[in-house]
Each structure stands twice: as structure tokens, then as C-alpha cells.
Amino acid sequence: PRAEAMVENFVFQWLRLRELENIDPDQEIYPAYNPGLLEAFRKEIRLFAGNIFSENASILNLLTADYTYLNEDLALHYGISDIKGGHFRKVQLDDDERFGLLGTGGVLMVTSYANRTTPVIRGAYIMENFQGVPPASPPPNVEDFPETPEGATV
């Protein structure tokens, strides 16, 4: 119970995860998103960080752990097919794409716009929250990207 309160109060505030409630992903771009997925993202982080704190593991595991906590719905969202049922359990990750908190859907969502990912914002988030260094301002002569034409794709 105390570890759960610390995760909810410390980790969610530190990583701005309370902002998840205010994000409404574009359903045309992210059709698989639903409110149940948001709650699964939150629970994954609570269980993951709570495990690290309760086991008195190295704080570095927040960034480097090769496991997470999943139920069937979240596993399918992540492309992992061998998890069955609604209860969350610790799952070893076999890929090189998802490590620690930075690979969780909640952190990826809070560092994205509703209609696209944002590597620059994600990088600034890492600098501010994990390195304690705010990013420098852009040089004054940098122009904005042109508007994307309606219906254009990459």
C-alpha cells in the first residue's frame, strides 16, 4: 500500500503522467485506442515502478529493465501474442525496442501529440525528467516546418 501511494504520488507527478487524462488520441490515426487502454497504461507503470521500489532495485532499472507488466489487451497492443487473460503479470520482453519506463505506452503517449509522435518533445522530456537539464532554446534563425497538406502521408 505505501509503495502504491509512492508510485501514484511520486512517479506520476515526476513523469507528468497525470497529464494522460487530458490526452485524447486521434481515433482516425490510432483506431485501437480506447479508455481501457489508458487505464492499462497507468496500471502497467504503477506495477512496474512499484516492483522496482518494493524490491529495492537499482533506480537505473527504471530505464533499463527488460520486463514490464501486461494483461492480454495491453500485450496485444504491444504486439505480444502469448499473454492471455485480464490480470496483469510480469512479462520478460524479448525485443530491443521496449525498455523500462521510456518504453511504456503511458510515457510514449504523454510525450506525443494527439495525432503524431514527437521525437523532439520526447527528447526534451528525457533531458528534463531524467537528466535534470532543460533543453536549450532553438537558434533564432530556425524556421517552422511547413504545414502538412490535407491527406498527405509519409
Can you describe what each PLM-predicted range is?
Residues 1-154:
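Active-site substrate-binding loop specific to GH73 endo-beta-N-acetylglucosaminidase modules
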